[in-house]
Amino acid sequence: MDSGGASDPSRQVRVRFLTKLPAPLRAPPTSIAVPADLTRMGLSEIVNSLLLAASPDHQAQPFDFLVDGELVRLPLQEFLLAKGISVERVLELEYVKAVAPRKQEDPCPHDDWVSAVDGSNPSFVLTGCYDGLARIWRDASECTHILEGHSDGITSARFINKGETEDRLHVVTASKDRSLRLFKFDTSVSVPKQIGAYKILRGHTSSVQSVAVDPSTNMICSGSWDNSIKLWSVEGSEEDGDTVSVKKRRTNSDSSGPEESLFEGSATSTFLGHTQCVSAVTWPERQTIYSASWDHSVRQWDVQTGKETWNMVSGKALNCLDCGGESSSLIAAGGSDPVLRVWDPRKPGTLAPIFQFSSHKSWISACKWHPSSWFHLVSSSFDGKVMLWDLRTAWPLASVESHKDKVLCADWWKGDSVISGGADSKLCIASGIEIV
């Protein structure tokens, strides 16, 4: 191969631009010569100029470029040299819309650290806070309901039903007070704004750190600092438990903490095996639960038998876990170092991660796969940053720096936005992310 000089500004490479984008964004497929030292920004300028020549109304936008399925993140000739591709061939460059936020929305202030977010509902965002309250935000801007009752900080919160066609929302929250609470309410009714739980779930002997909902939305599972995973029924009759009186969270105007009556439920199953805090759980398939722990392990559980069916030791205490990729077959996890790792449990005989992303500068606090893309993930870190990733490159697609302190949680919302919460007591929203 003719290596040439990677920094030689006179060297050129012949390229052909291809895309799967709709017709208005398709450049002519003829090959052209471009400078070999171009980066993706320079390549974007060329594509935009070609599109503008064909359509004067075209609005310039950034693109990313793939060669043989891998995103180009180096100057063109350096990339070719690294991959052993001849500079003499006509290089086919597939271009896609660049994945990066176009807008930072106004943050939503809270009274304490925002420790949990859920963006699985297209109309509402759910947040959990260290003030013991969960909040429902319409369009991530207006707080419509406050879910109260916990006596200590909320650590995790999830929508149970996604609410796409229903007026009623169903929510579960987990707390340092060792309990979980279930809420139901009508989103079309704004009064009362403060909502109490209809059911309290008790059984953990230490702080509940994580919660996940099964695909049928009939069950939930929780992970705790007592090292156990418990399964709970979302519904239930009074024959399954007792009605109890509990003191409501004290407020400044009512120091007595008035009592409320609600139904109490107990766990249907308990899974044992972890030796430290179960920091994250996910329930991707009806019969399979994955868990991550400060004991450095990721474990797979059979829901019916309660038995561990697979485990992997990462070497680091883990804070977060999610399943994604094709058929939700990949596992992403992060913890007490700056590296987000991805494993494929289908590969026998190896526990090495198949991808490692190492651009954060501190511990990873959360990771979530995009709901409709096999390739894209979001991560948050104690370094104050939220990063967007694509499996096809080791470099982050974008780094969002909306927070002024540690970021504790992050999620996708509506497919084109990222929501995050942190120690600066804010819910932040980065929007306009185009993933095709």
Curated annotation (Swiss-Prot):
- Positions of the UniProt region annotated as Disordered: 240-262
Q: Which residues form a coiled coil?
A: none
For biological process, the GO terms are: maturation of 5.8S rRNA from tricistronic rRNA transcript (SSU-rRNA, 5.8S rRNA, LSU-rRNA); maturation of LSU-rRNA from tricistronic rRNA transcript (SSU-rRNA, 5.8S rRNA, LSU-rRNA)
Q: Which SMART domains match?
A: WD40
What Pfam families does the entry give?
NLE (PF08154), WD40 (PF00400)
Query: What GO molecular-function term can you cite, just one?
Result: ribonucleoprotein complex binding
The cross-references to InterPro entries, in alphabetical order and at most eight, read:
G-protein_beta_WD-40_rep, NLE, WD40/YVTN_repeat-like_dom_sf, WD40_repeat_CS, WD40_repeat_dom_sf, WD40_rpt, WDR12/Ytm1
Q: State what this protein does.
A: Required for maturation of ribosomal RNAs and formation of the large ribosomal subunit.
Protein name (database record):
Ribosome biogenesis protein WDR12 homolog
